[in-house]
């Protein structure tokens, strides 16, 4: 299976419940190594605003279908209860400059469902 490295420009997050304030996140790096696109991405997020705290979200899945929910590995297991990966479109035959990557991560932080969408990719840097 090919490995790949992705650099993401932008992501948006929001709380879908009524009365919840919309929050934004910047995803500055997402990559997989020695795995296919459903392997074990490591996605780092940095909240917008004054806080410089960054959170690393690591998850893995053996699912053949990206619409299936993925289990996750995290240093603090109580932080995230569920994590899913959807609509991942990236093929090793694509040109390395083609920003053909889109995925939506659904997870629960505390009792609030949270949706994070990675919507833009700067470039696909490497395939191996």
From Swiss-Prot:
High expression in pituitary gland and weak in pancreas. It comes from the Eukaryota. This is Putative uncharacterized protein encoded by MIR7-3HG.
């Amino acid at each position: 299976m090919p490995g790949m490295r992705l650099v993401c420009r932008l992501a948006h997050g929001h709380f879908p419940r009524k009365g919840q304030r919309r929050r934004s996140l910047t995803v500055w790096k997402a990559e997989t190594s020695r795995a296919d696109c459903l392997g074990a991405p490591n996605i780092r997020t940095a909240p917008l605003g004054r806080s410089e705290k960054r959170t690393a979200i690591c998850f893995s899945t053996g699912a053949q279908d990206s619409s299936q929910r993925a289990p996750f590995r995290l240093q603090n297991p109580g932080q995230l209860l569920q994590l899913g990966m959807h609509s991942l479109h990236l093929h090793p035959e694509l040109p390395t400059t083609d920003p053909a990557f889109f995925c939506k991560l659904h997870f629960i932080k505390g009792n609030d469902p949270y949706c994070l969408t990675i919507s833009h990719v700067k470039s696909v840097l490497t395939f191996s």
